[in-house]
């Protein structure tokens, strides 16, 4: 065998090495594959939720990007237009979507365009008007004074001519007659394309300043190329023939009031009004709207020239307009008047004849002088609907500058012609009055930042000022004497006035001067006042102690301070000589103090008298000194001559303590335990050694029992160390002659002990509990007379027959005999002392029912 290992050792080792190598590689591969499979299974089943959460976190982190890397909004193309929509780009060109029928959709939001100046603004066209006219289904809240009730059948179609708005610079006389007089169309055109006063109802404005600022920039861009020179503006104003004004006069009476406030404004006014309508949920009311100073000087010359040309023409129309019947909507809601520039005055005069026919003429878009337009908006008066004198304004009158809620680009009406004439007459004063008006530019910021900026900053108030100012009284609270402020309120109020200008108290609060304060007690100051006003408040201004409001008359209290407590929490009372004769060693209880709402005092030490002038310790505050409800001094030195109450007659007869032949040693235990007969059942007694040591002390106190001091003692719980042991139960072998009497309620001495007269027996708690709960032995029942050894059981009688009558008679006889036997056995139980009880008594014969005798059948 040794040769085999030597010859094949190399091959065996190489085989084992290769086998171990490939085995390890295979095991490793299988382990990796199993681990991957188990991990995949875990992620697909149990760990799927965790994987989703991690993927969500990764998505959120990747999606967050910087706004600076985003594309400029100016690079995006304008949004698509629906049929019938129009849009004005940033360069002023009008983009028309076509003459297709209008689609009743909501207006395009303009909030984002207003906030980003680079974006081309969307111009609200007639497409947005039908949605706004739907508001007329509700009772109109704010309407123009000349606006008639809505007409539902006039809201269906719009002619294509309404959508055509010529460029500024064109004159009204150059319009072709085909556009001025097209084919007859349904009369709803006036409502759809013209009647949009609900759009310009006063709306609270938050971004009104910024919107108007952008509109002014756009209008200025359009105004400069189309305006040219002031001469061109005059030509435009003068281009309207006066014949068009004369045509209005004979036809104004039936219909002019209907269309006075239904003129279609220019796209700029529509844009501004639409922006205000869309932002009504975020706007805030503003009483006056201002404009930048830069527009005042640029338009001053044009305003002056334009108004001078229009004023004589307007004055010619006033007599006819004043004779028109005023049609007002049946409502009491506040109405508004709006004024507009002279260009609108001329155009409305020239367009009035066309409104007589069911035709809408295209509207010229003139350059609007910004200064006059906004100034007249600011000076628009607020008048309720119940005033019929709107058309009776004189040219020389100037309306007060009272703007409705935010200044909106409201629709011009015919009634405002008189307002503009007043402006023309007082142009110089208007320019000078608005020279100081500026517009606060709108600053784009986040909504959270805006909320933080609009928060009302409250000035921090120190705690010292709060404590120094008294709270105000309710207006309905009476100022009776019971509710008058205390001295603390008065002193604090005076100090608060001198230190900080806090809120003044109500005049109805009666402040009384500070009452007298006990200067013997230390002045206490609250922590707030002590920390912050130590340098400001002197010793003479120290705040008095808090108390109940009202006048408090302090009087002397003669109660002494409580005695020092002992180790067991009860005050120690020294021995007193005025005790009862039978229990002279026991100190009597002092009389209780009168009943009061405050905690009562412990028992007063009678051997020490404290004068009524003695105060509490100086270091103790006033609140800790107990005071009785009944104020005044009580003289404890008065001698009371009442004799102690007599003893009950029973205790006098049965108590061995009254026996004159009883020795002193035999009376000691009875005297010691007499006063605590009932208290012994509540607490545990001390060891007997302490009782023995206290006997000589009681012996010395006994001669002083003849003192005639009165005050019958009241029952009081003694400490645990002074309680005696309870009387031990007497066994059956004790003689009946020495049985004690029942202790009376006057705590007479307990019985003497027969074993030892001087020292009571040792009290064992366990033994007493065992004897108390030990039951007497059970009584052994005696044997019956019939079951005794000398007696034989009775022989049952033979049954006569099996008939029912015989059986009944047998049962009756059996019951009678068994009842007699039972009575006899019960009577003999007391005489039989041998044997145990009969356990078969419950199986008596009368208990078992009688059965038929199948064996002894009668033959």
Swiss-Prot record:
Membrane protein topology class: Peripheral membrane protein
Record's compositionally biased regions (Low complexity): 137-146, 154-179, 209-224, 240-290, 333-358, 372-400, 479-490, 704-714
Pfam family, one: AIM3
Family: Belongs to the AIM3 family.
Biological classification of the source: Eukaryota, Fungi, Dikarya, Ascomycota, Saccharomycotina
Organism this protein belongs to: Kluyveromyces lactis (strain ATCC 8585 / CBS 2359 / DSM 70799 / NBRC 1267 / NRRL Y-1140 / WM37) (Yeast)
Ranges of Polar residues composition bias in the record: 225-237, 412-437, 522-534, 605-614, 652-668, 814-825
UniProt feature, compositional bias: Pro residues: 587-602
Principal location listed in the UniProt entry: membrane
Annotated Basic residues bias: 772-786
An annotated GO BP: barbed-end actin filament capping
GO cellular component term of the entry, any: membrane raft
Keyword check for Cell membrane: no
Record's protein name: Altered inheritance of mitochondria protein 3
Stretches with biased composition (Basic and acidic residues): 447-457, 848-859
Superkingdom per UniProt: Eukaryota
Presence of keyword Secreted: no
Key words of the record: Membrane
Subcellular location: Membrane raft
Stretches the record annotates as Disordered: 38-95, 137-290, 320-358, 372-624, 638-859
InterPro entries in UniProt: Aim3 (IPR031370)
Biased composition (Acidic residues): 826-835
